[in-house]
Regions:
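Active-site beta-to-alpha loop of glycosyltransferases that engages the nucleotide-sugar donor
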Residues: 49-63, 83
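Conserved donor nucleotide-binding strand/loop of the catalytic core
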Residues: 74-75, 89-125, 132
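Short, acidic, metal-binding catalytic loop of nucleotide-sugar glycosyltransferases
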Residues: 63-74
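Acidic helix N-cap motif at the loop->helix transition within catalytic regions
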Residues: 59, 86-93, 145
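A conserved acidic beta->alpha catalytic loop
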Residues: 81-89, 104-106, 141
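Short beta-strand-to-loop acidic/aromatic patch adjacent to the donor-nucleotide binding site
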Residues: 125-141
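N-terminal membrane-anchoring/stem segments of glycan-assembly enzymes
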Residues: 1-41, 94
């Protein structure tokens, strides 16, 4: 066998090996029906907001959450009023949020506040009440399709 014929044979063999799996998968794909896709289950969200003296912006954020194009009964808004000296808690409650108040001058900061809030939610709501948590700053405003 000449060297060029040997090289041609090796190249043809390599291509045959590389593409031979298609001889199995193409006929199989003709007979297998695709799985029917289910409608996705809507998820329940808990929106967590840590706020400290945010009376001027907290209402606007809660209103933007309530204006979501996602089913309102699947969204619960929680606000932790952390060491506030203004009426942030009252404004948040008036806009429909569940409000917890925290007074701890020793452990100050968003991390402590969110930890406190998560402990309160775990105590007051059964496990599995929410599929996901969304953490927002009090000075945010979200678009109507943010959750979807």
């Amino acid at each position: 066998m000449k060297p060029i014929e040997l090289i041609n044979f090796l190249i043809i063999s390599l291509f045959f090996i590389c593409y031979s799996y298609q001889f199995f998968y193409i006929p199989v794909s003709l007979f297998i029906k695709p799985k029917a896709h289910r409608e996705p289950t809507p998820h329940r969200f808990a929106v967590l907001i840590a706020a400290r003296n945010e009376r001027s912006v907290i209402g606007e954020l809660i209103d933007s959450i309530n204006a979501q194009d996602y089913p309102a009964h699947l969204i619960k808004i929680f606000v932790i009023a952390d060491n506030c000296t203004d009426d942030t808690a009252l404004i948040a409650q008036a806009h429909g949020a569940v409000v917890y108040t925290r007074r701890d001058s020793l452990h100050v900061g968003k991390g402590y506040a969110l930890n406190f809030l998560l402990e309160k939610i775990a105590r007051d709501y059964p496990a599995g009440s929410f599929d996901a948590f969304i953490v927002l700053d009090a000075d945010n405003v979200i678009a109507p399709n943010y959750i979807t």
